[in-house]
C-alpha cells in the first residue's frame, strides 16, 4: 500500500536571498497601472503643503497611490486602509513597506483637498492625449447623493423668516413696556423699522444705565417695578441672541431654502431612495458629472434639487479646468431651458438636449392638441395667430418673467376678439372673456432646432449613447463600487472625497479597457507614461495648473 505524502509545509521557512515585495504580484494587476500613473504625474504643488522643518512626512506619491488604490477596491475608510497596509501585499508594495496610521491618512486627504482637483485634471488630460477621450463631446447628467448629516437636522428658510418676523413684533411690544421714552426715540411703533443685533445691544446698554441711575428705594411697589424692568431687559437680551441666531441661519442659507445643522453645505432634497413613499427630504448634494466613453471628465456639486440651473455653471467649471468648452453637449430634458439653449448657441456648443414632451411627440399614437398655442397657425409677417374658428388673434403686449437665475424670458400675448357664442369654446378654453395665449417665440425656435438635431442621424447616435454614458457611471458608482453616500461634512471635503473617487474610477475604467483589448498593463503603462512631462504635454498641464493658480489668486 502506497504511503500518503503531503507537500512540504514550513511557515517559518527562510530564504538565502531577500525577495522583492512585488514578486508575487501579477504583471497584469491594476496596482501596477496605479503605480505608473501616479509616478508620472506632476505633484510639485503638493510641496507647499509641507514644512521644511520637523519630522520628515510620508511621501505624497505614496499616500496618493494607497488611497486611490483603496478607492478602486471600494475601500473608503481610513481605518480599513490602515489594516490593509499591514496584511495586503498590494498595499504593502505601493506603500514601500511604510505603515501610516488612519489619522495620518485622513489628515493627508484633508490637506490635499484643493490640489487633488489638479491631479484629476492631469489624469483626464492624459486620457485625452492617449486617445481614450477627446473632450469634444460631453454627456452630462446629475444624481442626488445623501450627505453624512442626520436627516432630522433641517433648517427651513420659511420657518426662520416667519419666526424672525414674530420676534420683531415681540421686541417692539417689549420695548414699549420697558421705557416709553426710549421707545419713542427708536420709533418702535413704526412696524417697518428693522432691529439689528447691534441696535438692540445699544438699547440694552442704555436701559441698564437708566436702571442703575435710579435711586434706591424702600417702597415695595417701586422695588417690584424695578425687578420687572430688569427682567424685561434680560428678556430683551435673549431676543437679541435669538435674532443673531436667525441672522446666522439666513447667512448660511444664502439663496437656498434649507440646510442641515451638522452639514451646512447640504440641502434637503427628495431622493429616489424613499422607503416610506411619502416624499421624505434628506440632506444631500446634487452631483453633476460630465462623461465621455464612460470616463468622468468633470464634476461639480450643487445645492439645486433640479438640473436646469446647473448646466451653465457646469460649463464654467469645465472651461476653468481645461481652458476650453466642449463642441457637443448631450443631456436629458431636465436641462432644456431657454437660458441653457441660448448659452450654448452663443458659445458655439452644438446642443443635443431634449425638451419637455419630446418623447411624447415621438410616440406613434401621438396627436397634437389642435387648440394648443403651438398647433395654431401663425403669420410671422403680420404677427398674429389664427384660432380653430378662423379669427385672428392679434398681439396685445409682452410679458416678462424672471427665472431663479435672474434670466429674463419674454412671452408675446395674443388675444382673440369674439369668443362669445363660439361652438368650440368649451374645447378651446374655459376662462371668462376672450381667449389670451402667451407664446415664447425664442424658446419655440430653440425647440425646433433641438428637434431637428435630435431626429438627425447624429442625434439618434448621441441619444443612444447618453443612456450608457452617465447612467452607466452612476450605476457603477452606486451599486458596484458602493459609493451611495458621502462620508464627509462640508462642500469642500465632499468635493475632495469625490475627486479621489473620480481619479480611482477613471484608472479602473482604463485598466478594464486595456484588459478587454488584450494589452499587458505594465507594458502599456510604460508606453503611456514614460517621459510624459518631457514632451509638449508637460507644457499643457503646467499651463493649466498655472492658470488655476492665477484664477485662485
What are these regions (language model features)?
Residues 2, 14, 39-41, 62, ...:
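Intrinsic-disorder/low-complexity peptide segments enriched for small residues
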Residues 26-68, 441:
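Basic, short loop/linker segments at the boundary and entry of helix-turn-helix/winged-helix-like folds
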